[in-house]
Amino acid sequence: MTTVTVTTEVPSSGKTEDGHVFCDSSSAHIIEETEYVRQMRTTLEKIRNHMFKEKEGCGNARHKLDAEGSGNIQNGSDSTTDPTCLDLLMENMRRKDQQLLEMNRENEVLQIKLEASREAGAAALRNVAQRLFDNYQTQAGDLEKKHEGRKHLLQVNNLEKEQALKGSAESLNLLSEKLEEKHGQIVGLENRVQRMENEKKTLLEKKLRLESKLFQLKSNAANPKSCQDLQTEISILQEQISHLQFVIHSQHQNLRSIIQEMEGLKNTLKEQDTKIENLKEKVTVLEAQNKELKTRVAHWTETPRTLVSKAVSTSELKTEGASPYLMLIRLRK
């Protein structure tokens, strides 16, 4: 008679490179133990069938001996059956019954150990799954906090860029208004200078006529008073022409100054346009990064639930007739 002692040790846990944890040594031990129990069951079934056949053979022999004894009694024969054969058969039957009883007990013990191994494997897997869940929850929380911090920083930068963009747009509008104002001033000055030039031309023509008239009067030696009046009028015209010339020169200087200011405003306007374009590009990049962070946060928020659903399958582990090997196979799928 063979006595089988099965010792099961379930280690705590082990980690793989991708973060999943499995009881490798415990799984191998459970697989070997399950295979050994299966072989023992097969052997016990064969022994039981063999014993039943021997018991049936002994029963047939006993029935044959009883029949022979009855025949001898009916025939009045003085011969009797051999008691040694019956004793041997009975002893053999008792021994086989005892062996069968012990084997049944061993089978029950093995069944209990197998159930205990299953329960231990299931408990270990549940423990591993819980640790995985806690690990994923911690990682998800840390990543979510990290991404939320980056998201807040990006939002602050985005707000600053938007405010700078708004300020640049306002400055651009002010520059445009100043350019319009300067353009109006230039047009007004040009018109004014043109009128002064026309007036100067008129005064010069009038002065030439008066000088020609004065020359004729002097040639004829006419009325001296008329000559004096003409000279006075010519002097007044000359003063007016000189004043107009001074004003025209001043207006030309103002016009050049305004044109220079306008050119400076145009350059500033171009710089503001470039700055606004750069700010728009930065705002677009920040918005894209913000969107990407939102996607990552959503992904890391949903990922632990999916992974836990793969690791925790205790309902399948408790199904009747499932071996620890099958439980590990289901967990790894």
Swiss-Prot record:
Record keywords: Nuclease included? no
* Record has Plastid as a keyword: no
User: Which key words are in the record?
Assistant: Coiled coil, Cytoplasm, Cytoskeleton
- Residue ranges of coiled coil: 86-120, 160-302
Where in the cell does this protein reside? Answer: Cytoplasm, Cytoskeleton, Microtubule organizing center, Centrosome, Centriole
The biological processes this protein is annotated with in GO are:
microtubule anchoring at centrosome; protein localization
- In terms of superkingdom, the source organism counts as Eukaryota
Q: What is the first-listed, main subcellular location in coarse terms?
A: cytoplasm
Q: Which GO terms describe its cellular component?
A: centriolar subdistal appendage; centriole; cytoplasm
Assembly and binders:
Interacts with CEP170.
Role description: Centriolar protein required for centriole subdistal appendage assembly and microtubule anchoring in interphase cells. Together with CCDC120, cooperate with subdistal appendage components ODF2, NIN and CEP170 for hierarchical subdistal appendage assembly.
Q: What is this protein called?
A: Coiled-coil domain-containing protein 68
What is the originating organism of this protein? Mus musculus (Mouse)
